[in-house]
Every structure is written in C-alpha cells, then in structure tokens.
C-alpha cells in the first residue's frame, strides 16, 4: 500500500518528459495525504504526471517532487453527488446525498457515487423507482435493500476494489462492470435487471439465489473474473466465457452446455454436463457431484 514516507517504486535514474498517467488502487486512498510514488536520480519535474484510471473518477491529484521523490496529494473531485445516509428516492426534500459537502437531493439521470467516508451509511434503502444515469461504487460493503428498484438504462460500475450487495429487485438495462478486485454479491434473483455483466481482472460476481439460465449471454464474453455460486443458486453456462473461473458452493449446481471448456471449475457443488459432448481442458476440482445428462437415442459424452 502507499504511504507518505517510502516511495512505492525506486529506480536508479529517471529521464524524459512525456505525459505520464498515474493509476492508483482505490482501496487505501485518503485525501490530504502526500503519497510517495516514485524515487530516482534525475526526477525533478512533476508537471507531466496526471492522475488516471478509477482514482481520477473520484479525486483531483496534485503532483510534486521533493528530493528526487514524486508525491501525489489527493482532494475530492468537485461536483460529485455522493451517498451519505437515509433513503434513496426522488423526493426533492430528501437530502440523503452530499454535493461538495452540502446536503443535497437526488434527481433521475444524475451520476451518483458510493464512497467510503465519515458518516456514510453503508445500508442503502431504495424507495420507489430511481433511474440514475450511472452508479459508481468505489467504497466497500455497501448493501442495497428496500422495495424500490433501479430502472432505465442505468450503468453500474464497481471501481477497483469496491464491494456491493444487491438484495432488492431491479429492472435496469445498462451494463454492469466490475473492476479489478471488486465484488458484487447478488441476493435477489431480480437484482441485475436485464443488465449484461463484465468481469475484469480478479473481480467476483457471487450469485446467492435464483436460477440463472443463460449465463453465457448474461456475462460479457470478454469477462475474466470469477463467477461464484452460493446459497441455493444454480445456473447454465456456455464455453464462450473462456476467461471466467467458476466456484461452486455446497448445494449449488452449474450446468455446462455442450462445448469445449478451458475454464477452472472448483468447489463443493454439483457440475452437470448437458446433452451433447463436453470437453474439459481446464482445472476441474469438484468435491460435490458430477452428472451427465442423456436423452434416449442421443449421444452424450464427457
């Protein structure tokens, strides 16, 4: 993790003046601290460094150089509507949000942010329909509950290292994107609406309930994280999701449509091969059951 004393990277010498984008992990960042990033002989200029990636969504970065070490000091980005506490609805008198430190109301179409911070309630109760343009989650352990629903073409982004549990039913249709190291726990079979989910890096999508037929289309084909089934969840997937790792909890079931799989599949659940031919080239370590389905007169091989 970053600190203010020791540079994250030390090199023998540094030269050049090309524009350089600095990307920082979000999990341990705080405002008002000068983080030591890079140290090396010849480092005297900070003007060509800029803040990029997920951190740039939330912070302004001021770079400086002292004694051959590059530092960045972060401040909250202005104009972001950040969750504070209370109930999420569209009432103009409901100031459950903060805009540059001022209690504020939410209106449909806005981009909203769920970040860690003093006085932030991680339990988000949704009342009625809400339709933000985009939801950015950078904090950890947020939980959405209530009788309300996220609707419209909303996109849901879990930035690197963020975590969110969705226990309410939603109908939003925009993409759901999980950044590296983030985790989305689905506690309601209708939580994802009609959204397509993209897993990036070491992100985790955990389905704890429901029957998820068609995972091969609900997940973006470029996904690379882990799909975890827990509770009483079950699902059917296809070989198209070549980069996804599957983790099956006890009492869960994953059915593989016919195809050739190079995926890692582990856990204590049940793995089923549907009618047709399945070839498993990946690491498969299941302590539950293996089942092969067959139809009279139809070939089925494992």
Can you describe what each PLM-predicted range is?
Residues 25-153, 163-165, 169-171, 185-188, ...:
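Solvent-exposed adhesion/ligand-recognition segments of exported proteins
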Residues 72-79, 170, 209-210, 230-234, ...:
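Secondary-structure transition/turn motif
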Residues 18, 67, 139, 160, ...:
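Residue-level signal for tight coil/turn positions that link beta-strands
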Residues 7-16, 97, 101-104, 112, ...:
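Short, T/G/N/S-enriched strand-turn elements that build extracellular solenoid repeat scaffolds
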Residues 1-36, 86-90, 194, 203, ...:
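Extracellular beta-strand/loop-rich repeat segments of large surface/secreted proteins
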């Amino acid at each position: 993790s970053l600190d203010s004393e020791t540079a994250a990277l030390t090199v023998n010498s540094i030269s050049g003046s090309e524009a350089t984008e600095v990307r920082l992990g979000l999990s341990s960042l705080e405002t008002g601290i000068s983080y030591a990033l890079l140290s090396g002989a010849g480092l005297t200029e900070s003007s060509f460094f800029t803040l990029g990636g997920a951190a740039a969504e939330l912070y302004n970065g001021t770079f400086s150089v002292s004694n051959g070490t590059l530092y960045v000091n972060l401040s909250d980005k202005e104009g972001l509507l950040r969750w504070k506490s209370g109930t999420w609805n569209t009432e103009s008198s409901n100031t459950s949000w903060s805009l540059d430190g001022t209690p504020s109301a939410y209106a449909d179409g806005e981009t909203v942010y769920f970040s860690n911070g003093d006085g932030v309630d991680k339990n988000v109760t949704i009342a009625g329909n809400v339709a933000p343009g985009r939801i950015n989650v950078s904090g950890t352990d947020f939980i959405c509950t209530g009788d309300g629903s996220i609707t419209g073409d909303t996109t849901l982004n879990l930035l690197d290292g963020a975590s969110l549990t969705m226990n309410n039913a939603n109908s939003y249709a925009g993409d759901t994107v999980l950044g590296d190291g983030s985790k989305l726990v689905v506690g309601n079979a209708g939580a994802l609406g009609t959204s397509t989910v993209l897993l990036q890096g070491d992100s985790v999508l955990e389905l704890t309930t429901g029957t998820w037929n068609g995972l091969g289309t609900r997940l973006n084909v470029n996904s690379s994280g882990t799909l975890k089934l827990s509770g009483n969840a079950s699902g059917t997937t296809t070989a198209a999701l070549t980069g996804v790792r599957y983790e099956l909890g006890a009492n869960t079931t994953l059915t593989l449509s016919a195809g050739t799989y190079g995926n890692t599949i582990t856990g204590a659940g049940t793995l089923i091969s549907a009618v047709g031919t399945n070839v498993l080239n990946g690491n498969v370590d299941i302590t539950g059951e293996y089942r092969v389905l067959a139809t009279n007169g139809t070939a089925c091989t494992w």
